[in-house]
Amino acid sequence: MEENMLRFYRLLNKRLFMAMLIISAIFAFCFSPQFRNIYGLPMHIRVIEGETALFEVNFPLTVSVNHDNASIRVQNHDLLSITALSRPVSLEPVKLGQSTVEFKLFGVIPFRTVQVDVLPPIKLIPGGHSIGVVLRSQGVIVVGNSPVLTMQGQYATPAKDAGIIVGDVIISINGTPVQSETQVAEIIDDSGKNHRNVDILLKRPDGQQHVTATPVLCSETKRYRIGLFVRDSAAGVGTLSFYEPESKIYGALGHIITDSDTNQPIDCEQGKIVLATVSGIQHGKRGHPGEKIGVFIEEDHLLGNITKNSQFGIYGHLNAALPNDKYAQAIPVASMSQVQIGPAEMLTVVDGQTIDQFAIEIQKINLQEAPESKGLVIKVTDPRLIEKTGGIVQGMSGSPIIQNGKIVGAVTHVFVHDPTSGYGCFVDWMLMESGIIPKKERHSARKLFTFSRQFFFD
């Protein structure tokens, strides 16, 4: 009896040990980098015809392409199912279109179905041109409050009392859409003369809101006021990144335009770009970024309009083609997985209107599955540019980055502590913002794939 019980407990302990071992293995797998990477597998990817997308898959996955109208092949074989374990897997486009790639764990457990779009090759004319940017906001932006000295010698703050704060955007007053500082002042003064309050529609990050303010007669201006400073437009100098030669769609700056006082993004109602000339350079140094001193020229001669102010710059249509002495013909774009750490060049203007090529180095690549800024870390290596400007300065935003004869991105920011270094954004995101290629859905930043350098076949 005791021997049977002992045998039973030994068997039970053995089974418990095996169960604990299996549970531990499952937990270890779930918390492993490989599982976290697999969990972040995107549902939708794009490749350009002529590219070979090379992936490092760090787990035993079976990769197969659907049999219907396949536009890609795996590992240089049509309609092939392969099992990848810590070795590269390549997806090679064979024609334009859309395919479905299926991933299975251990070749058995269905895990994810990924849609792959094969896009036509895209060629753009590189920029580098110095441009003047004039952007008019949707509504007017509140940039400050100011007490109003009344006829009774007292200070009143009607706008502040109504809850209006810096950064608010005034969309309309008394139901009338407003577009300029002058229009705002006239409506408020007219309401005050008629002894009426003003109903103000505000736009805020969390939505729209109506507030009511009572205009008071200002003893200094003899006009009715509510004590606000507003701005209806922004202007500055930047750099053209590229344009598409057929449609004349362009991209510039590489980052969003914000109001200088509130740092709030400006909703684009309308805008224009004009030619600008660089008349001087404020040299950049550690802790003090430099700046291009630009002057608008031929303001009546518009280069194009501005239809979008986004996280990745401004976009619109050029009225005519802009010549580029450095690149007279359109050149291909490189998707982010083609970008390599190493030498590259940037195009920008540092004197007059002459576009120059300067050597830089791409030092870090932050591969992104969803649109994010600061995808590239770059460093100026050209002694001519360092001597002239100290490195990257304000006004260089949008300067195209070219590597191996392809546009890979644009300069966006300078490091305050090191003006020879800064950030750039991938051209992928700029093309999506411009509408040249459709946007893809935002996915988790966690990755199944460790993207290796892609090979490109012309």
What are these regions (language model features)?
Residues 1-11:
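N-terminal Lys/Arg-rich, disordered targeting/topogenic segments
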Residues 73-82, 159-182, 401-404, 408-413:
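Conserved PDZ fold ligand-binding element
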Residues 2, 14, 24, 33-36, ...:
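Interdomain regulatory linker/hinge segments that flank or connect interaction modules
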Residues 20, 212, 216-390, 394, ...:
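Serine endopeptidase catalytic core focused on the charge-relay Asp
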Residues 103-121, 173, 185-227:
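PDZ-domain C-terminal substructure recognizer with occasional recognition of PDZ-binding tails
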Residues 155-169, 192, 391-395:
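A short glycine-leucine-enriched loop at secondary-structure breakpoints
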Residues 82-96, 172-201, 207, 418-420, ...:
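PDZ domains, with a preference for the canonical peptide-binding region formed by the helix
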Residues 13-17, 27-74:
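Solvent-exposed, low-complexity, repeat-rich "mucin-like" stalks and linkers
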